[in-house]
Amino acid sequence: MKKYSKKDRQMKLQVAIEENPFITDEQLAEKFGVSVQTIRLDRVALSIPELRERIKHVASVNYADAVKSLPIDEVIGEIIDIQLSKSAISIFDVRSEHVFKRNKIARGHHLFAQANSLATAVIPNELALTTQATVRFVRSVNEGERIIAKAKVRPATDNRAITIVDVKSYVGDELVLKGKFEMYHATQK
């Protein structure tokens, strides 16, 4: 692995983050052969925000106007991709405030909230409410893990006011939650 001068590393770091704003400090440290702390110091010197803030910025710029059914800041997790009436993806980092103190396992309502708010966000109407949800928790999620929720809208049925949204949440490639959300939707008058 090539060793870069501080100036070269910082220039390449800036380019790497511009190309992929979702890259983690750990991935950058590995890429440049330095410590995570060095990457963090470089980011601070370059006024580049941490991953969480970069994700929020990308989501607010790209999706704030797209999501009609609820304000973007009410979505649990950060939306990283959305195609209204089709699909959506969000990420949620499990931190200490989301887990049971004794065993560091995430409280189920956080996983449910991420999936439910994503199912709501993918509906293109101003009013979208969950009428029924069937959720299966496949495995526990631990503090420090990242949950990636993927919502997929099923083709329309006879009842146009109800849309079914399937949500699957993963940690890495491992399924942790599977849900079916029946969403009532209408344009507010």
Swiss-Prot record:
The keyword Transport does not apply. InterPro entries: HotDog_dom_sf, Transcription_factor_FapR, WH-like_DNA-bd_sf. One of its GO terms (biological process) is negative regulation of fatty acid biosynthetic process. One of its GO terms (molecular function) is DNA binding. CDD domains: hot_dog (cd03440). The keyword Ribosomal protein does not apply. It comes from the Bacteria. SUPFAM superfamilies: Thioesterase/thiol ester dehydrase-isomerase. Belongs to the FapR family. HAMAP family: Transcrip_fact_FapR (MF_01814). Transcriptional factor involved in regulation of membrane lipid biosynthesis by repressing genes involved in fatty acid and phospholipid metabolism. This is Transcription factor FapR.
